Amino acid sequence: MVPQAKLVVASLILTSALIQTSEAVGGIATYWGQYTETEEGSLAEACASNLYSYINIAYLNIFGEGRYLSLNISGHCSDCTFLGEEIKACQSQGVKIFLSLGGPYGDYHLTTDGDADRVAEQLWSSFLGGSKSTGVYQPLLGDVELDGIDLDIQIGPPEEYDVLARNLKDLTKDRTRPFYLSAAPKCSAYNDSDAYLWTAVETGLFDFVWVKFYNDTSCQYNNDTAAGLDAFYRSWYDWTVSLAEGNKLLIGIPASNETDNSPLGGYIPSDVLNDQIVSVIMTSSKFGGVNVWNRYYDLKTNYSSSIILEYVNSGTKYLPLRTKFMYQNA
């Protein structure tokens, strides 16, 4: 017997999907840069794996208050300008490369609109193809024009990131290469003006929102099929109806059921993800795919491979997803 609440939530999702039916095609995103080259491989290797449509270089974790920008790409490099050639190779393969701002550690914050203005100028000049202005230009990744900026803000005050987003979109509006903004809010940040990134996401400027459905017990999958799926579905539906048309929502999940030292709640076995989640939500025009945390764990578990092989013909990065009503045999 299927719980009534479960059916109601699934019905809401499916009704929304039918209203906005489109050819739902998703991609896989991941984060690279927080482990050594021996542990997670190079950026070039990640791109050549043919697993990912989007790769976030993590992290730019010092910015704001008029300071110079600083990267923390753990164990890979101190002088990371050589990555410029790897980034260009990735882009030539169709992989979109983002620079992720924030992370769990660092010294970053925006205190005023002027602060957000300056950081936007620094990013534009250093990573996005803008003018190489003296005092602003820092070629930390070499001479590159990245595809996008990702916000994974986890510490400091939550204000001013909406201003940063507006400034970045304005600065990049005339460039030839499309510019993308992405954000990685916690699933519980929905409709919470005090939460990281909610106010920014409300601007409607974020092309990709890869919501973290992990480390957040109120809205993540919690192993028990009925209760775990209900929490996920309710949160997914809330986020779907809140996003502006054209924004894509990706499922942010860990590629392993534990970190080095402690459980990483929210892990979804790939068979559950494929058969009981993606197959239900993929008809929404806002479905954008899956964001896997992170390249290191993905290499250990081959998690992305298990998703791709379920849905994709050999040789393509994208997931043309099948239609299936989860409760057809209920």
Swiss-Prot record:
Q: Sorted alphabetically, which Gene3D superfamilies does this protein's record hold?
A: Glycosidases (3.20.20.80)
| Membrane-traversing stretches | none
Which compartment or compartments is the protein found in?
Answer: Secreted
Region labeled Binds to IgE in 100% of the 10 patients tested allergic to Indian jujube and latex — which residues?
A: 292-301
Tell me which InterPro entries the record gives: Cts1-like, Glyco_hydro18_cat, Glycoside_hydrolase_SF, Glycosyl_Hydrlase18_Chitinase
Record keywords: Allergen, Carbohydrate metabolism, Chitin degradation, Disulfide bond, Glycosidase, Hydrolase, Plant defense, Polysaccharide degradation, Secreted, Signal
Report what the protein is called. Answer: Endochitinase Ziz m 1.0101
Q: Which residues form the signal peptide?
A: 1-24
What Pfam families does its record include? Glyco_hydro_18 (PF00704)
Q: What is its EC number?
A: 3.2.1.14
Enumerate the residue ranges of region (Binds to IgE in 70% of the 10 patients tested allergic to Indian jujube and latex).
72-86, 300-311, 309-320
Reaction catalyzed: Random endo-hydrolysis of N-acetyl-beta-D-glucosaminide (1->4)-beta-linkages in chitin and chitodextrins
Domain GH18, first and last residues per copy: 26-330
Gene Ontology molecular-function annotations: endochitinase activity
Q: List the disulfide bonds.
A: C47-C90, C77-C80, C187-C219
Function (record text): Defense against chitin containing fungal pathogens.
* Gene source species: Ziziphus mauritiana
- Give the UniProt record's GO annotations in the biological process aspect: amino sugar metabolic process; chitin catabolic process; defense response to fungus; polysaccharide catabolic process
Family per record: Belongs to the glycosyl hydrolase 18 family. Chitinase class II subfamily.
Record's GO cellular component terms: extracellular region
Keyword Hydrolase carried by entry: yes
